[in-house]
Curated annotation (Swiss-Prot):
It comes from Shewanella sp. (strain W3-18-1). Its EC number is 4.2.1.10. The record marks R19 as: Transition state stabilizer. This is 3-dehydroquinate dehydratase. SUPFAM superfamilies: Type II 3-dehydroquinate dehydratase. Substrate binds at N73, H79, D86, L100, S101, R110. The gene is aroQ. The active site is at Y24, H99.
């Protein structure tokens, strides 16, 4: 059985490298995904990626995936999207939640997540490296 992981990135992450680099770092999303693709390939795992600023596109991708694991950075949808949470619960695919910044050290409204209580794990505050940690953990979960 081949292993597949879906990487889901929410709104404004397409601006990585330009948007508040002091908070989110200087790497672009393309840079991050390239690193993750290399990591996945070395582990013999397929990585599928979607980034969208539109909630319905993320939901449709989650509904359509045949992945066995999801890594999600819901971005601003973390604090607002019951629909995206319901999509994750509806497909019942285990997932890791990732945030580039330490959301708990930021504004109070960023402290609540609609996903954390259902995630296998939550990784925040490590910048782009957080995705690598999540991918390593997901691969370990899949391969036992």
């Amino acid at each position: 059985m081949s292993h597949k992981i879906l990487l889901v990135n929410g709104p404004n992450l397409n601006l990585l490298g330009r948007r508040e680099p002091s908070v989110y770092g200087h790497q672009t999303l393309a840079d991050i995904v390239a690193t993750l693709n290399q990591q996945a390939q070395q582990a013999g795992v397929e990585l599928e990626h979607i980034q969208s600023n539109a909630e319905f596109e993320l939901i449709n991708a989650i509904h359509a995936t045949d992945a066995q694991m999801i890594i999600i950075n819901p971005a601003a949808f973390t604090h607002t999207s019951v629909a995206l949470r319901d999509a994750m619960l509806g497909v019942a695919i285990p997932f890791f939640e990732v945030h580039l910044s330490n959301v708990h050290a930021r504004e109070a409204f960023r402290h609540h997540s609609y996903f954390s209580d259902k995630a296998i794990g939550v990784i925040c505050g490590f910048g782009a490296q957080g995705y690598e940690f999540a991918l390593s953990a997901a691969i370990k979960q899949l391969k036992g």
